[in-house]
Amino acid sequence: ILDIVHERTIKTKKASIETRMAKTVEDRLNMYRMRYDIISDKIEKSIKKIPKINKIKWSPPRRNVKKGEEEVGLVLSDLHIGHSHSLEETGNISEYNTEVFVRRLHGLQKSVSDIYELHSNLYNLPTLHIFCLGDIVDGSNAAGAWSPVYIDTPVYDQLMLGFEHLSQCIEYLLTVFDNIKFYGVRGNHGRIAPSGVEKDYANWDNLIYNMLRVKFSENPRIQFNIPKTWWIMERIKNHNFLLVHGDDVKGSGNAIKNLEKFSTSMFGILKEKPDYTICGHFHESTELTSNFGKMIINGSFVGADVYAIKNLHKFSRPEQKIFGINNSHGVTWRYDLDLEYDK
């Protein structure tokens, strides 16, 4: 009997404790609810006391109202006229030949005029800067290890094709822009002899550039800058542009980081800081912004060729860069022109 009484006493105490615990939990929940209600009431009152802010609505600008002037930069590099590889050789991944080059150049022209039509609604765009960064030709078999089995056009014909089609391209762009400034930097594929046999500027690219200069010599709307150096530093709209082909950008690994190191070294040599360092050569369209400035690597007309796919295990689209240049902000809008897209 005593055990039964003891057990009942324990159960009664447990029940009492559980009741008190439940009440304590409920009291706490009620306390938190009241706190939340008080806070909510205060927030609601505060919101109602906030002064109303006039709504700002966007309204379209009046037609023909422009915001000043910008200039346009078009990067041309790595056309590799004379190079040839087929879809069969790349497993249906890529092809390139003279016909493809011409088609892509015409597509580029159309893209440039389309972009001009778009951005000229906002700014006056009187001047086009053509940054021609080399490897216009694919080169001669004896001048370098260019995989001669993938060159199907003699270098003389490469030269004439480059001159003919770049002339036509410039003539077309002169119908779009008031003025053109052409900058010619040679590439490594254009050298006329193996490295070290002739001076660096003895280069098929330079010959094409100078043929263009002679052709347009009586046209005051186009200017040419074709130095014997392998680089150009040009000040455009209060910003310095350092132009190189890219074969002198040394280092293993990341090309864009190596370009940054090159830009830093050139600053030490030239005692003038480049705001933008632009190169080609690597056949990959990429950019890097650092504390030092902006690095820009242009794409190529070729895209992924047999060497890139087989040896480097890389794929890249055929692209070229175009951008706006503002007096205050430097490079503003920019596009990678997809040359594979039929215009």
Q: Where are the regions that the model predicts?
A:
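Core catalytic region of metal-dependent phosphoesterases/phosphodiesterases
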Residues: 58-79, 87, 91-214
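Histidine (H) residue identity feature
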Residues: 6, 80-83, 106, 119, ...
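Basic, amphipathic N-terminal segments that precede the first structured/catalytic domain
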Residues: 1-122, 327, 339-343
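N-terminal short leaders/motifs
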Residues: 8-22, 176-194, 238, 242, ...
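A broad, low-specificity signal for short, low-complexity segments enriched in glycine/proline
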Residues: 27-37, 91, 144-145, 202-205, ...
